[in-house]
């Protein structure tokens, strides 16, 4: 499960489930005959721990809020954007996200963006259709039929937004206490914390789960299966995120050409169209949006202006006091 059969002449890409598919790097396969080596992580904390423990990879695909932390840990190398033919077509606001350009050097290539929100069964919880709130995930009426992401950013931060933390990513002690209390209150209501989005999607499709934290792709897939789901714009605000690639300090220099080929393939218009249409995510390449019909974009929930969409919601930032929050989350899950 963890690593696909490794081939010594390809770089290793460490990424999320779903972003490893060949359709997102077709030009690389066309040029080099196969995909690179792929390893999958459930979240960035797991990825970081594995790399710290000596797992060597060439590229990782974290979200922006991790980049300053990984930079400070000394595990990133700058990326030479002049080697990327698709760089000029990347949405300009994504190129300068705080914490991703350091001392004038680019440490992150923005390729994927979207939201963390709630996917829910409109047929099973109709009272939320015109009352969209994160509060559905705390509704005792749906005890045992709710699911939450098993992660700091999409779990603990959701609780922080729900309790009204002024800045969920930099909470006061009082807000941390309230967040902990909210997670404790929620625990007996959950069917599970999900680590794999496909596990959550199956439960929603079956009606075992009525509402869950989800990314756009979960909603897009369920909707495509004809399930009566909606994707919330919660009154407290959805979370907006941007993910993309980092070049690891211990990359294999002999594979650098292939590393840049992979990045450029993922940044292409054709990869962007696939990601937009199949997953309902935004893509870094502005031209990819021009290649999808306005009707299709609307159906997928995109206002035609990517910049406007990126400016909406609560933008993920590096989490202050991360180790303490991680410990608190583990304690809550253990019933403490």
Regions found by a protein language model. Give the residues of each.
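Short beta-strand->loop
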Residues: 77-88, 108, 227-239, 250
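A bilobed periplasmic-binding-protein/Venus flytrap-type ligand-binding module shared by bacterial periplasmic
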Residues: 119-124, 160-164, 242-255, 274-278
